[in-house]
A protein has these predicted regions:
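Glycine-rich, proline-tolerant flexible connector loops at the mouths of alpha/beta enzymes
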Residues: 56-67
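Active-site-proximal loop/turn and secondary-structure-junction residues that shape catalytic pockets
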Residues: 14-16, 58-60, 92-94, 137-138
Length: 173
């Protein structure tokens, strides 16, 4: 059995973070994919693409430990209607601003989000779902260490510590 429904896959840019200038940036919103996802999915049909990568947006769905998966549900409903398999990226550069990046809570809170998301999505899938816990761990670590993705406390110049924290979060069960 193939893991993916189609060889070719689409990806909708879902980076979601606070810029170094302190401005929230959701690429899902900036590209209007957050409101055009059904149209975007239908546009894939002539190309025989039935697999897409989407981002959950940890910063957007996390309400201090409870979650608003409204957007996730809407995209899943549209994906089902259009025969699309979604592979979810859970953290795409961004995380809640009120979270100390280097604390153990970062790891446990991310694990809680992952578990809650998997439980929420379970009824939507007939086949095993595909998840990417943290998008591009090396690039994310570099971006934090260079100050592109600000953290509290600052992670500038601490690329090894940053990467270790991201790996701890991604592998926590």
């Amino acid at each position: 059995m193939a893991i993916f429904r189609s060889f070719w896959q689409a990806g909708f840019e879902g980076a979601d973070f606070i810029t170094r200038a302190g401005h929230p940036l959701s690429m899902d919103n900036a590209t209007a994919h957050d409101v055009r996802y059904a149209e975007d999915y239908r546009a894939l049909m002539p190309f025989n693409m039935h697999t897409v990568r989407e981002s959950v947006g940890w910063r957007l769905v996390d309400k201090s430990g409870s979650y608003d998966f409204t957007t996730v549900a809407k995209k899943m409903m549209s994906a089902k209607e259009n025969g699309i398999q979604i592979c979810w990226t859970i953290c795409h550069y961004g995380f809640p601003a009120n979270l100390d990046f280097f604390s153990p809570e970062f790891v446990s809170r991310f694990a809680h989000l992952c578990g809650s998301l998997a439980a929420f999505l379970r009824p939507w899938y007939e086949e095993p779902p595909v998840y990417s816990p943290i998008n591009e761990i090396s690039f994310t670590a570099w971006g934090i260490a260079e100050g592109l993705f600000p953290t509290t406390p600052p992670g500038v110049g601490q690329s090894e510590l940053v990467k270790r924290q991201l790996v701890r979060a991604a592998k926590k069960k």
